C-alpha cells in the first residue's frame, strides 16, 4: 500500500518567516495544504537591505504564529503530521537558529521526527514538487544570495557545474536598484523599469563569456552601471526617467545574455549524461524575472530539452519547498536528532571547492 506522508516545513533563512504543510501519497503528485509567508520588507526598507539582527528578532516573534496559521489552513493538527522539516542552513545564522529551535521544540514536545533541510535543496527540488520531473535534471538556482548550475541526481545528490564567483544576480539587481533610487526588493523594480527602456542604448559587459566554463560574475556589471550613472549625472546634473529605464533595460539585457549563454554550456554537459527525458529547471527568486525565463525557454527549445519553472509564489523563499525537500529526505530514510545545528554555510555539492564571494545567504555554496 502506498505510504502517505504529511510534513510541516519551517523557513527562516533570510527575511521571510514561513510555515507550510505538504502531503504526498507515494507515486502521486504532492499537495500543498497550506503555505504561510510573513515578509519583513517594511522592517528593512529604511536600511537598503536586510539587517540580520532585526530579521532574527522578527523570526522569533513570527514563527509560532506562522506554524499555527499553517496548521489551521491545512486543516490538520500536530498529531496528523509524520515529521517536521526545517531550514538548517545556509543563511543568516540568527534566523536559521530561530527556525531550528522552533522545529526542535515541536519535535521534542510531540515525538515527531526532525528533518534538517538545506535551503538550496528546497529551491532545487521545487520543480519536483510542482511538475513531478524525474532525476537527473539540470537546475539553475538563481536568487538573492546564490547562483549555480547543478545536476540533481537525488534529494541529497547534486553535482555543481559552475556558479557565481562574486555577486549573485539577485544582489546585482538589488544594488542596481539602490544606485538608481528604486525601491527594494530590486528585482521587480529593475524589471518594471526595464520594460519602459531601450536595452540597446547602453551596452554593458557580459562577464566571463570568454571563458568556456559555467562560472559567472556580476560585480563588474554593477560597477559598469555605476560608472555610466555617474557619467550621466555629471553631464546632465541628474537622471531623467528615460535614463533610468534605459539603464535598467541595458543591465537586465546583460544579465539575460550571460545566463542564456552559460545555460547553453551547462546544458551541453548535462546532455552528455544522456538523460532519458532531458529537463532544465530554474528556481530561486530571480527566476521570477520574465525576461530571464523567456531566454532560458528559447535555449532549451533549441537543445530539445523541456524547460520548467515553478509558479512565481514558489520561486521566492517559502516553507512549502522545505516541507517537500524534507519529505523526500524522510522517504529516503534520513532523520536528524535534537542535536541538529544551524549552519551559515552549507554547499549542496560537498565534493566541489567552495565558490568565492559571500552573499546575503552566506557563501556561494
Curated annotation (Swiss-Prot):
It comes from the Bacteria. The keyword Cytoplasm applies. Binds 1 Fe(2+) ion per subunit. Fe cation binds at residues 119, 123, 317. Residues 192-201 have a biased composition (Basic and acidic residues). Its EC number is 2.3.1.234. This is tRNA N6-adenosine threonylcarbamoyltransferase.
Amino acid at each position: 500500500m502506498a505510504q502517505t506522508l504529511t510534513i510541516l516545513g519551517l523557513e527562516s533563512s533570510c527575511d521571510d518567516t514561513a510555515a507550510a504543510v505538504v502531503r504526498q501519497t507515494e507515486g502521486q503528485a504532492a499537495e500543498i495544504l497550506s503555505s504561510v509567508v510573513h515578509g519583513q520588507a517594511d522592517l528593512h526598507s529604511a536600511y537598503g537591505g536586510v539587517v540580520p539582527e532585526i530579521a532574527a528578532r522578527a523570526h522569533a516573534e513570527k514563527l509560532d504564529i506562522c506554524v499555527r496559521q499553517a496548521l489551521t489552513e491545512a486543516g490538520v493538527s500536530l498529531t496528523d503530521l509524520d515529521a517536521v522539516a526545517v531550514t538548517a542552513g545556509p543563511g543568516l545564522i540568527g534566523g536559521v537558529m530561530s527556525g531550528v529551535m522552533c522545529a526542535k521544540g515541536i519535535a521534542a514536545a510531540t515525538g515527531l521526527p526532525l528533518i534538517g533541510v538545506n535551503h538550496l535543496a528546497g529551491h532545487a527540488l521545487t520543480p519536483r514538487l510542482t511538475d513531478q520531473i524525474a532525476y537527473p535534471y539540470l537546475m539553475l538556482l538563481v536568487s538573492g544570495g546564490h547562483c549555480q548550475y547543478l545536476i540533481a541526481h537525488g534529494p541529497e545528490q547534486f553535482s555543481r557545474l559552475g556558479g557565481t564567483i562574486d555577486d549573485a544576480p539577485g544582489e546585482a539587481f538589488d544594488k542596481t536598484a539602490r544606485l538608481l533610487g528604486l525601491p527594494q526588493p530590486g528585482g521587480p523594480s529593475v524589471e518594471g523599469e526595464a520594460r519602459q527602456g531601450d536595452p540597446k542604448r547602453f551596452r554593458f559587459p557580459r562577464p566571463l563569456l570568454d571563458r568556456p566554463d559555467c562560472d559567472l560574475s556580476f560585480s563588474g556589471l554593477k560597477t559598469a552601471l555605476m560608472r555610466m550613472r555617474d557619467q550621466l549625472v555629471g553631464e546632465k546634473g541628474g537622471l531623467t526617467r528615460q535614463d533610468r529605464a534605459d539603464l535598467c533595460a541595458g543591465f537586465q539585457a546583460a544579465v539575460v545574455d550571460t545566463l542564456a549563454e552559460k545555460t547553453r554550456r551547462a546544458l551541453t554537459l548535462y546532455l552528455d549524461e544522456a538523460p532519458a527525458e532531458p529537463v532544465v529547471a530554474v528556481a530561486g527568486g530571480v527566476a521570477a524575472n520574465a525576461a530571464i525565463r523567456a531566454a532560458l525557454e528559447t535555449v532549451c527549445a533549441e537543445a530539445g530539452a523541456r524547460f520548467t519553472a515553478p509558479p512565481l509564489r514558489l520561486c521566492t523563499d517559502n516553507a512549502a519547498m522545505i516541507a517537500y525537500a524534507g519529505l523526500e529526505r524522510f522517504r529516503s530514510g534520513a532523520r536528524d536528532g535534537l542535536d541538529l545545528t544551524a549552519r551559515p554555510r552549507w554547499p549542496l555539492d560537498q565534493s566541489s571547492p567552495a565558490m568565492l564571494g559571500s552573499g546575503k545567504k552566506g557563501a556561494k555554496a
